[in-house]
């Protein structure tokens, strides 16, 4: 199973993310965007509990930055939505977990949720 995880850059609850990731079997693969907050927390937790992180074919730093980092220098403000599309295209998730307390105030996580729903991918919103 492939699970795309995204979330708030201001997310701080390690416990909530750990609880969610521990629900999945060890053969689960996690797709994430390398952003501060929820993404970095969940990447660290996934590594610590033995869940594989999937990296972008363009990511040449898979040891330190396993995932799909946005190229802000190349794409500017469009980098986030471009990265979100790339995570969906390359990662091919079965499920999306969105860690956000107020999705209506979000730009990045909200964009990922919208793109996922348009593709018919189940989205679970988890609040802090």
Where are these regions (language model features)?
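Glycine-rich phosphate-binding "P-loop"
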Residues: 1-13
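Acidic/glycine-enriched connector segments
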Residues: 10-128
């Amino acid at each position: 199973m492939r699970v795309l995880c995204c979330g708030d850059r201001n997310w701080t609850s390690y416990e909530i993310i750990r609880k969610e990731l521990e629900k999945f079997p060890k053969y689960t693969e996690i797709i994430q965007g390398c952003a501060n907050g929820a993404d970095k927390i969940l990447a660290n937790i996934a590594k610590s509990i033995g869940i594989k992180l999937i990296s972008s074919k363009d990511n040449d730093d898979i040891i330190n930055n396993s995932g799909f980092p946005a190229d802000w220098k190349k794409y500017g403000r469009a980098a986030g939505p471009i990265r979100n599309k790339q995570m969906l295209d390359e990662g091919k998730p079965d499920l999306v977990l969105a860690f956000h307390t107020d999705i209506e105030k979000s730009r990045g996580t909200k964009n990922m949720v919208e793109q996922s729903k348009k593709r018919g991918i189940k989205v679970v919103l988890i609040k802090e």
